[in-house]
């Protein structure tokens, strides 16, 4: 089965899950507890993160969701009478609603986590079969965002067929994005929106729509069951791969996979390459920078996953980049940046180690963002040639003219005015680093 999209792919005319007040129209911005603390969470850590989002200026930049991930409930089971999930009284002595009150008082929103199975990934009670009860609980507690995972699925509710997700988390090899050893592929024309996986997620969607509160719905089915085909009608974002880790190899692999899904991203629905690892692990500063820039240009949800009360200034600077956040949240243009040249590889090569290196995307202000990545492990030169950038090649000087095409260019990282750049912009990049250019008017 071939998963790889082609260069001729057009925008997908999928039905979108449109919510009131613009909720989910642009990609989510926020913070989540998992990459920072895993299961070691409590009310104090969540409220501290919320306060830091305000104190560090992140709220002013648009970050708004403070999301509680797995391990927030009593692990032994539900209330035997009401069947409701019980918040852990040791971790959350005032319940989830108590945390919601504090988060809302800061002008922020609160998110929570469950799974479309019997248990969560950490073994806590999940929502399969209790969708309406849990949606009502979430609404009553003041929840604004639900991350819905794919763990704890009973064997009688697994899919009849297997969809090809070319991701290393299952240990297989995927030559150029294909699943050569897939033995139970769906027949041609099969509608994955009717699959058991899709129905599990649709049940929670319907439950959330039935309550008197707008809750952003973030699907986390790891790309299974061709979620790209039905995710936009079901949720506001959908995971397209297995979990991220704080390693460059994994970040590059996910960026490569997601680069072939950009035609699915637009207002109200976004493929999700997982939460940010900026500030975590042993990532170099260039790798942190490249990670954030790629996610922002792909218009992925930008969900911070590091302890904010101890964040390094250099990492905060990356997360606070105004030009990239402005591109990411453009209220007029919903499409993300697209790769226009692979650089290290021939175009349209599926390579987990070397994702597409040249990206561009338009803005409502008329500027064009151009990203150049050095996917190699040593210093390399990269060049943005204006005639190769789709949004620029038809502007200005005619192709047959001897005069070189020039544009006003600004460095998105430093804010430095690079002046009138003729023909191309060339830069030396450290291993796994990026340059992001804001290309303005002709000069």
Swiss-Prot record:
Glycosylation sites: 79, 156, 176, 181, 212, 232, 282
Subcellular compartments: Secreted
GO MF entry, a single one: alpha-galactosidase activity
Source taxon at top rank: Eukaryota
Enzyme Commission designation: 3.2.1.22
InterPro entries reported in the protein's UniProt record: Aldolase_TIM, Glyco_hydro_27, Glyco_hydro_27/36_CS, Glyco_hydro_b, Glycoside_hydrolase_SF, Melibiase_C
Annotated S-S bridges: 39-71, 121-151
Stretches assigned to coiled coil: none
Pfam family, one: Melibiase_C
Active site: 149 (nucleophile), 243 (proton donor)
Principal location listed in the UniProt entry: secreted
GO biological process: carbohydrate metabolic process
Catalytic activity: Hydrolysis of terminal, non-reducing alpha-D-galactose residues in alpha-D-galactosides, including galactose oligosaccharides, galactomannans and galactolipids
Gene3D superfamilies: Aldolase class I, Golgi alpha-mannosidase II
Keywords, sorted A to Z: Disulfide bond, Glycoprotein, Glycosidase, Hydrolase, Secreted, Signal
UniProt GO cellular component terms: extracellular region
Binding locations of substrate: 221-225
Signal peptide per UniProt: 1-20
Function summary: Hydrolyzes a variety of simple alpha-D-galactoside as well as more complex molecules such as oligosaccharides and polysaccharides.
PANTHER family for this protein: ALPHA-GALACTOSIDASE B-RELATED, ALPHA-GALACTOSIDASE/ALPHA-N-ACETYLGALACTOSAMINIDASE
Entry similarity comment: Belongs to the glycosyl hydrolase 27 family.
Protein name per UniProt: Probable alpha-galactosidase B
Organism: Aspergillus niger (strain ATCC MYA-4892 / CBS 513.88 / FGSC A1513)
Gene that produces this protein: aglB
């Amino acid at each position: 089965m071939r998963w790889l999209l082609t260069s001729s792919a057009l925008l997908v005319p999928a039905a979108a899950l449109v919510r009131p007040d613009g909720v989910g129209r642009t990609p989510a911005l926020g913070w989540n507890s998992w990459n920072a603390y895993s299961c070691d969470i409590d009310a104090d850590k969540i409220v501290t993160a919320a306060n830091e989002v305000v104190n560090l200026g992140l709220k002013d930049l648009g970050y708004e969701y403070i999301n509680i991930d797995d391990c927030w409930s009593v692990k032994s089971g539900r209330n035997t009478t009401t069947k409701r999930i019980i918040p852990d009284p040791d971790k959350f002595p005032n319940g989830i609603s108590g945390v919601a009150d504090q988060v809302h008082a800061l002008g922020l929103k609160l998110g929570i986590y469950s799974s479309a199975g019997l248990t969560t990934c950490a073994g806590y009670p999940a929502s399969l079969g209790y969708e309406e009860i849990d949606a009502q609980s979430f609404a009553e507690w003041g929840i604004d965002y639900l991350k819905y995972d794919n763990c704890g699925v009973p064997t009688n509710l697994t899919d009849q067929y297997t969809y090809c997700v070319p991701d290393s988390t299952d240990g297989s090899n995927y030559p150029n994005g294909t699943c050569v050893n897939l033995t139970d592929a769906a027949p041609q024309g099969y509608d994955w929106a009717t699959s058991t996986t899709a129905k599990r997620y649709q049940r929670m969607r319907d439950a959330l729509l039935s309550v008197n509160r707008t809750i952003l719905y973030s699907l986390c089915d790891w790309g299974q069951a061709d979620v790209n085909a039905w995710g936009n009608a079901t949720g506001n974002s959908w995971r397209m791969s297995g979990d991220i880790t704080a390693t460059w190899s994994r970040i590059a692999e996910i960026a490569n996979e997601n680069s072939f899904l950009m035609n699915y991203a637009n207002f109200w629905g976004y493929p999700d390459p997982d939460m940010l690892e900026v500030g975590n692990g042993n990532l170099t500063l260039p790798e942190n920078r490249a990670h954030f820039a790629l996610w922002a240009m792909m218009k992925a949800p930008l969900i911070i996953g590091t302890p904010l009360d101890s964040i390094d200034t250099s990492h905060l600077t990356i997360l606070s980049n105004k030009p990239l956040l402005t591109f990411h949240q453009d209220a007029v243009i919903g499409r993300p940046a697209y790769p226009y040249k692979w650089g290290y590889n021939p175009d349209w090569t599926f390579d987990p180690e070397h994702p597409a290196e040249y990206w561009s995307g338009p803005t409502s202000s008329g500027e064009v963002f151009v990203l150049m990545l050095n996917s190699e492990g040593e210093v390399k030169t990269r060049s943005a040639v204006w005639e190769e950038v789709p949004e620029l090649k038809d502007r200005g000087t005619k192709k047959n003219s001897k005069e070189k095409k020039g544009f006003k260019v600004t460095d998105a990282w430093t804010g430095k005015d690079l002046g009138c750049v003729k023909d191309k912009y060339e830069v030396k990049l450290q291993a796994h680093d990026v340059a992001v250019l804001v290309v303005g008017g002709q000069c």
